[in-house]
């Protein structure tokens, strides 16, 4: 339940640390994020902030969306995303408020959501990482087939969830716990370590990582428990 930003994937490059190490990074354009709607428990049943990114010509906006943007007195955008937030935050925001990159800091961990690149219809080897069969030595027709997909008359069917051939990619995916290396507030760019789903120009959503907020177990409790178990054993 934290406020985030929406934007577009610019592409990948690399940067060098002070020690001279090369790190692959993804550049995200999250400039000009503005609030289009505030949702409260009284009116909508939950608290959330709706944000838009980019610009779209009025002729390219359908009537329902045009009315929605006009009601908020906000220039029409290309993307609309909603962030669930605590009710206390709603008082600091209003339609038209610009959300800057100052909600993030270098070194902070974030979750990035995007749409993976579509690969079309793919076989089980590419889709699920299956191993291929022998290239020769008696194998003449089953090099890349998935193999058996079930049993005999009993149960006489293929179990649900069986990994088979099918469409690969073009689905929403979230990569968690990525690190922000640099922030270019002047140009509205986030430099994030590693890769994220999608091709250049794809829509992305960036929000504070939910994993970094969880309590971690450093192993001290387990170590103490093991020590107690050993000390409780009877001597030989």
Swiss-Prot record:
Gene Ontology molecular function: rRNA binding; structural constituent of ribosome
One GO location term (cellular component): cytosolic large ribosomal subunit
Biased composition regions of type Low complexity, renumbered to the chain: 217-228
Keywords from the named record: Methylation, Ribonucleoprotein, Ribosomal protein, RNA-binding, rRNA-binding
Modified residues (N5-methylglutamine): 153
Biased composition (Polar residues): 133-145, 206-216
InterPro entries listed in its UniProt record: Ribosomal_uL3, Ribosomal_uL3_bac/org-type, Ribosomal_uL3_CS, Transl_B-barrel_sf
GO BP annotations, alphabetical order: translation
Segments traversing the membrane: none
UniProt-annotated stretches for the region Disordered: 132-153, 200-236
Top-level taxon: Bacteria
Post-translational modification comment from the UniProt entry: Methylated by PrmB.
Family: Belongs to the universal ribosomal protein uL3 family.
Function as written in the Swiss-Prot or TrEMBL entry: One of the primary rRNA binding proteins, it binds directly near the 3'-end of the 23S rRNA, where it nucleates assembly of the 50S subunit.
Subunit and interaction comment: Part of the 50S ribosomal subunit. Forms a cluster with proteins L14 and L19.
Protein name (record): Large ribosomal subunit protein uL3
Organism: Nitrosospira multiformis (strain ATCC 25196 / NCIMB 11849 / C 71)
Record lineage: Bacteria, Pseudomonadati, Pseudomonadota, Betaproteobacteria, Nitrosomonadales
Gene label: rplC
